[in-house]
C-alpha cells in the first residue's frame, strides 16, 4: 500500500504450539506476528496448537501488533477447522499457505467472510498466477515463502537471490498493481547479522514493505532497514517544499541538490513521510 496506516517492517513467525513463545511475543518489537499453525507445528500438535492459540488471542495483549494466523491448507485434515476456529476471534488476518491460484483464496473466503486474507506466495504456479491471485477482492496482503519456492525451483542459496528474482518481481508487481501489502521472505541464518542486513536492504530496494523473520534477534535490523532514515525524511521535506514553491511561481518542476523534482518524486516523498509517521505512531502506542 502506498500509505499504510500500520507498518509491516518486521513480521515475526511464532509457533502456535509454543505457549512460552506466545507469551514472550507480547513484548517484542515486531510490527506484526504470524502465529503459525502450519509448518512450525508437528502433526500430533495441530489441534492443541489451534486451541491454545485461540485462547491466547482472546486473553493476551499484543498491543497494536497485527495478529496474523497462518492456517493449514484446505487440502489437509486441519485447514477448514483452523479457519472456523478464528472466525470472530481477535485475529486480524488469516494467512493462507501455498496459494497457487485465486481459487485457493476463494476456498477460504467462502468459510470466513469477515476477516482480511493474505496469501503465502511460495509455489511455482503461484508465481505464474500472481496477478490473478492479487486481484481477488478479499486479499489484502502477500507473504513471500522463499524457502518453499527455492525447494520447488531446486535452486541453491546465493546472497544475490538470483534464482528467486523472477518470482519476487512478479509478486511485487502484482501486489502493487492491486494495492496490497507485500512482505519479503525469511533469512534463515538468524545469527548472521551482515547477511540479514544485506537481504533486508535488497528487499527494501526492490519495494517490499518489510521482511518475515524467524527469530527475535532479527527484529532490530529489519525495523531499522525498512524505516525511512533521517536523511530520507529530510530530503522528502525539502523536495516537497521546493516543489510547492515552484508551483507558486507557475512551474511544474523544481531542482533539489542538482536533480529535477517532478510530481512523481513528490508522490514518493509523501509516501516516505507517511511511512515515517505511521512508524512513529505505532512506536508511541
Swiss-Prot record:
Membrane-spanning residues: none
Recorded hits in SUPFAM superfamilies, A to Z, give:
Phosphoenolpyruvate/pyruvate domain
Positions annotated to bind Mg(2+): 122, 148
UniProt xrefs under InterPro entries: Aldolase/citrate-lyase_domain (IPR005000), Citrate_lyase_beta/mcl1/mcl2 (IPR011206), Pyrv/PenolPyrv_kinase-like_dom (IPR015813), Pyrv_kinase-like_dom_sf (IPR040442)
Keywords assigned: Hydrolase, Magnesium, Metal-binding
Q: What does the subunit comment say?
A: Homodimer or homotrimer.
What protein does this entry describe? (3S)-malyl-CoA thioesterase
Provide the species name. Cereibacter sphaeroides (strain ATCC 17025 / ATH 2.4.3)
Lineage of producing organism:
Bacteria, Pseudomonadati, Pseudomonadota, Alphaproteobacteria, Rhodobacterales
Q: Which gene encodes it?
A: mcl2
